[in-house]
Amino acid sequence: MNCCWQVVEPCYKSALSYLCVKVGNICMLKENLVLLKSAFDELKAEKEDVVNRVNAGELKGGQRLAIVATWLSQVEIIEENTKQLMDVASARDASSQNASAVRRRLSTSGCWFSTCNLGEKVFKKLTEVKSLSGKDFQEVTEQPPPPVVEVRLCQQTVGLDTTLEKTWESLRKDENRMLGIFGMGGVGKTTLLTLINNKFVEVSDDYDVVIWVESSKDADVGKIQDAIGERLHICDNNWSTYSRGKKASEISRVLRDMKPRFVLLLDDLWEDVSLTAIGIPVLGKKYKVVFTTRSKDVCSVMRANEDIEVQCLSENDAWDLFDMKVHCDGLNEISDIAKKIVAKCCGLPLALEVIRKTMASKSTVIQWRRALDTLESYRSEMKGTEKGIFQVLKLSYDYLKTKNAKCFLYCALFPKAYYIKQDELVEYWIGEGFIDEKDGRERAKDRGYEIIDNLVGAGLLLESNKKVYMHDMIRDMALWIVSEFRDGERYVVKTDAGLSQLPDVTDWTTVTKMSLFNNEIKNIPDDPEFPDQTNLVTLFLQNNRLVDIVGKFFLVMSTLVVLDLSWNFQITELPKGISALVSLRLLNLSGTSIKHLPEGLGVLSKLIHLNLESTSNLRSVGLISELQKLQVLRFYGSAAALDCCLLKILEQLKGLQLLTVTVNNDSVLEEFLGSTRLAGMTQGIYLEGLKVSFAAIGTLSSLHKLEMVNCDITESGTEWEGKRRDQYSPSTSSSEITPSNPWFKDLSAVVINSCIHLKDLTWLMYAANLESLSVESSPKMTELINKEKAQGVGVDPFQELQVLRLHYLKELGSIYGSQVSFPKLKLNKVDIENCPNLHQRPL
């Protein structure tokens, strides 16, 4: 008997255990269903939170983590299965309750097995749901690695194929860690380096990152480090406070920890640079450095493994490049002269391009012969040298009118590769007196834009997105012209030079223009070498670290016409000696911390342009009442807001033609909008803490930039009545505006911050030229453009938009109900943060 029991016992216990589990599942079915529903609801809420975090991260360009993607996929599967199971349980329960007692007795056996099966499934699903819950992901997305290669635009080339092939072959050799590319300015070194950069796309799997850094004659290690840091995505909020040593450590740490295979492309080195000081580890098999320079000596000092010279074009290639654009073949005599002119360009692509543009409009033999005579008059011993090239390039300058020539040389005051806003450049020219404003400022600006077109057409300026810049060789040529040919005029240009004090000047009386743009100058003390009087006309000191300007610095500058002190954040006051600047026409104090205008400002009777924008500590601008010739006044974003007293002063300035303002009082805004003259000349307005309608703002016909902070923005204009009733209907709404309406036609930049009742910005449909939009901390905004309000308008919004910033808009669900194209918006100009309901990125 015992033997039999020993055989049966394991089976008995197993069956009993199985039966207990089955009975337990039946007995616990209702309780487990309740637990399953509760756990399922918690899992769904957890999933929703994770999805919102993922969407927010992806809107900022992040990629969801693989572990998060797997978890979401598992949750979606179990979500569907659990829903089906709970539906079955609900249906069974309902069927059981509706069945008769007889039917329940007849189906007891089948019901028992069905209940047992259901109970088992519910218990199993409950276990699965619990296993997926409570993951508590610290991070759900990560920033994708930077693209291996940032492709750069490159113009059509002639004669570089052989050099490109040779350079590429050398670069691909393991033993070549560093290559130096040398050649004279304008020969095509940057173009070659650009082609090399783009060629890495073909072998992107071999490298992790290709870094392009543009150097310059005055560039320092810090600026190179900044460019590398940006490319490696390690420039956080503290980066700007780091010393060069700290930056080098960070760069080195990232490169060593990541162990990337990287290529560093340094364009336009003028002297040797310590790679160790930058933070580049000892070059190994995975590292490559390629640099360009005008000097072969730099290649030697940098210890390049191989030096590659970019030579000038052959005679045939030079003619192909020139004739490709000018087409001289049909005119035999002109063609013969053109070939001689091409020969004078020494095969230099830049010279060929500039001369080609200069001669493109010349159609007679006399004009072409005159150009050749000019080139042949230059000293032959200069041929093939940098100055010899300047002489050739100067032909284009010689064809300029006197006014245009002055405007061209002025551009050399800005840093190398600096993109100058065209409207700002024209304002400088007007301030200098290069352009006569007697027919009004708008006519003067039109003439300024015409000059820019002429300089671009002559190949002396390059154009990009309403900005212009100079090729570094053209800039060098401009500075050479000033030093060699402009009698009695001398430029001192030390931009991006790391200066901590004023440069040494042998004779201040010979200097007419000085540019110390982008340096580290903190103080301008008394200098015994200052003469009793200088002849300085232009002084650029913007973007330094100035704290004090003391002594007789201003007292000896009665000839100064343009003074730019902008973006010196630590300047809190200016000396009374500013009253000595009796010739001053343009004064830029934007971005400074001045608390009040200097007492001597009122005597500057020739001042026509005063810029006080972004002066957050300035309390009053009342002194401007004495500036009767003032044409331009800017105090957008200034603490010195418009008040009734200042409004009367502005009305009395009869010469005023351009205005940007700050307003933080409702009644002042109403009175301001009631002034047809002032409202009509306003190009920028900063509104804070106001109740305002877009219809009222729409009457500012010249508005370019608009910022509203903590404003209650409405669509109708019923709150604005009185003086301007004839110019807009107080009840105007967005549905009544047509695309032909002039409102917002010039509006290019809009900033909205902390407007808590704002739901949409449909009125931006009519800002056809909007380029930049920033919206932040407006919790009720659900969409940028309301589809219903926009119906029938027939306008595609955001066609010119280039910058989009959306922050802390928790209810924002869409940009626009319909699909919107953003033809000019680039991914790196989209900044979206904390918009959890915005599931579709603009691009």
From Swiss-Prot:
ATP binds at G183, M184, G185, G186, V187, G188, K189, T190. Residues 28-58 form a coiled coil. GO terms for biological process: defense response. GO terms for cellular component: cytosol; mitochondrion. It comes from the Eukaryota. Residues 141-440 form the NB-ARC domain. The LRR repeats probably act as specificity determinant of pathogen recognition. This is Probable disease resistance protein At5g47250. It comes from Arabidopsis thaliana.
